[in-house]
């Protein structure tokens, strides 16, 4: 829908502000572009932001998807959009890395696959990428959305 880059950023900010306002949450919205990716962030009080973040970031993912679809509707060139809320994505990544490390250690120690709790595609990808550096485990996903799980399995030599 939006034309040039600045217009697109403004339109995304407007969409995000409307979602927050409709949810009854007072926030500041910051939208910028970094290395070809549109970076958007909700800034505000943690308690209020919880409504926009949702369980394990599910609401944040949905808002991100909605804003991206609306901003680039009918356009040939689409840029990735990453929506954060007061550093939530970084905190969640740290927590997922810890879970991944524990699962990898258990898989190697016990010699059998470890199933992680169901998670969204972005989080599964983050764990896949994180554990790629290890040569003693492999990862794969199984199941159907929304119950799709990541499996951490020991590499058999």
What are these regions (language model features)?
Residues 1-157:
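RNA-contacting regions in translation and RNA-metabolism proteins
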């Amino acid at each position: 829908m939006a034309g040039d880059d600045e217009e697109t950023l403004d339109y995304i900010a407007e969409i995000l502000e409307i979602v927050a306002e409709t949810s009854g949450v007072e926030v500041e919205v910051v939208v910028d572009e970094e290395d070809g990716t549109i970076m958007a962030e909700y800034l505000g009080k943690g308690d209020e932001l919880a409504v926009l973040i949702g369980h394990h970031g599910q609401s944040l993912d949905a808002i991100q998807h909605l804003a991206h679809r609306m901003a680039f509707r009918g356009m040939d060139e689409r840029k990735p959009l990453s929506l954060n809320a007061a550093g939530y994505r970084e905190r969640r990544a740290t927590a997922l890395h810890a879970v991944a490390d524990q699962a990898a250690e258990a898989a190697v120690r016990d010699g059998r696959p470890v199933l992680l709790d169901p998670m969204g595609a972005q989080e599964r990808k983050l764990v896949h990428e994180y554990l790629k550096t290890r040569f003693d485990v492999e990862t794969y996903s199984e199941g159907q959305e929304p119950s799709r799980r990541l499996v951490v399995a020991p590499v058999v030599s």
